[in-house]
Amino acid sequence: MQLEVHKRLEEKMTKTLGVLKDDFNSIRAGKANPSMLDRITVDYYGSITPLKQVASVSAPEPRLLIIQPYDPSVINGIEKALMMSDLGLNPSNDGKIIRLNIPQLTEERRKELTKVVKRVAEEGRVALRNGRRDANEQLKKMEKDSELTEDDLKQAQEEVQKITDKFNKQVDEMLVKKELEILEV
């Protein structure tokens, strides 16, 4: 039963890392990357739809994204959504496709983005700690219900801490990698 707790904890923490990775990918680092538009939603015939469902996004050059709508009538909606986003990009619409030139990041913007990345990483760590707390509570309940001995509880809690440390280390590695990517000129 205690292995079940550890297994659920690992699954929960793996999902947390996946979310963190997606969050990091949506933060632009100076290079054109189609995943930076993953969070953009477009008003498509009255319903809010993710950009990738109404258009294809490609990066033919390091500082250029091309957005080609599947339905040309939605191009103005896409342009409006891009202008309203927090990416700070100015779309160029030629009626068929939208070009997004990715400007070089200023030193000030780079520092701002590293703060954002650190905050996102801390949110990930908080989620990991919450998972650890939940697992430890389950283990204590199992001990209280006489499903675990005191020694087994201690051993299981140590295993929970090892799992948490392993995932925290991965968060730290992801953070360092993203910071280097942002600060790279």
Swiss-Prot record:
Keywords: Cytoplasm, Protein biosynthesis. One of its GO terms (biological process) is translational termination. GO terms for cellular component: cytoplasm. It is found in: Cytoplasm. InterPro entries: Ribosome_recyc_fac, Ribosome_recyc_fac_dom, RRF_sf. SUPFAM superfamilies: Ribosome recycling factor, RRF. Residues 132-152 are annotated as: Disordered. It holds the Pfam family RRF. Its main location: cytoplasm. The keyword Oxidoreductase does not apply. GO terms for molecular function: ribosomal large subunit binding. Belongs to the RRF family. Responsible for the release of ribosomes from messenger RNA at the termination of protein biosynthesis. May increase the efficiency of translation by recycling ribosomes from one round of translation to another. PANTHER family: MITOCHONDRIAL RIBOSOME RECYCLING FACTOR PSEUDO 1 (PTHR20982:SF3), RIBOSOME RECYCLING FACTOR (PTHR20982). This is Ribosome-recycling factor. It comes from Alkaliphilus metalliredigens (strain QYMF).
